[in-house]
């Protein structure tokens, strides 16, 4: 737990560490056909990096920071059922929604030309 980074992706902020995997929303909006297994990913929206006792904060994002990773697979979250009904109006509507997620693993955190591994 010496090295971690906080990234901004999919409308949320994630705390990522090298060697761990995470689920991301809206990651498959790029093109679902290119997100096969072991597709390499670079994430440039890095908000903060903590390495040993050093902390690097960015004004919005860090300039020379990238997160290198690869997509393991894409999958759907559990289905949510939405049921709307108005009493005495005979109005009923049933909707379903499944969130599309991409599971990716962080290989390394790069900052100023240095790569930090687990």
Curated annotation (Swiss-Prot):
UniProt KW Iron-sulfur keyword: no
Record flagged with keyword rRNA-binding: yes
GO MF assignments: rRNA binding; structural constituent of ribosome
A Pfam family per the record: Ribosomal_L21p
Keywords from the named record: Chloroplast, Plastid, Ribonucleoprotein, Ribosomal protein, RNA-binding, rRNA-binding
GO cellular component: chloroplast; ribonucleoprotein complex; ribosome
GO biological process: translation
Function as written in the Swiss-Prot or TrEMBL entry: This protein binds to 23S rRNA.
Family: Belongs to the bacterial ribosomal protein bL21 family.
Subunit-structure text: Part of the 50S ribosomal subunit.
Protein name: Large ribosomal subunit protein bL21c
Organism: Anthoceros angustus
Lineage: Eukaryota, Viridiplantae, Streptophyta, Embryophyta, Anthocerotophyta
């Amino acid at each position: 737990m010496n090295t971690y980074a906080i990234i901004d992706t999919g409308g949320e902020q994630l705390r990522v560490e090298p060697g761990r995997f995470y689920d991301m929303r809206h990651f498959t909006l790029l093109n679902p056909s290119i997100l096969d297994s072991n597709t390499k990913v670079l994430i440039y929206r890095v908000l903060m990096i903590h390495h040993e006792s050093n902390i690097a904060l960015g004004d919005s994002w860090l300039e020379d920071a990238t997160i290198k990773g690869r997509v393991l697979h894409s999958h759907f979250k559990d289905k949510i059922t939405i049921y709307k009904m108005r009493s005495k109006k005979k109005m009923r509507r049933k909707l379903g929604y499944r969130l599309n997620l991409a599971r990716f693993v962080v290989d390394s955190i790069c900052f100023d030309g240095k790569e930090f591994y687990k």
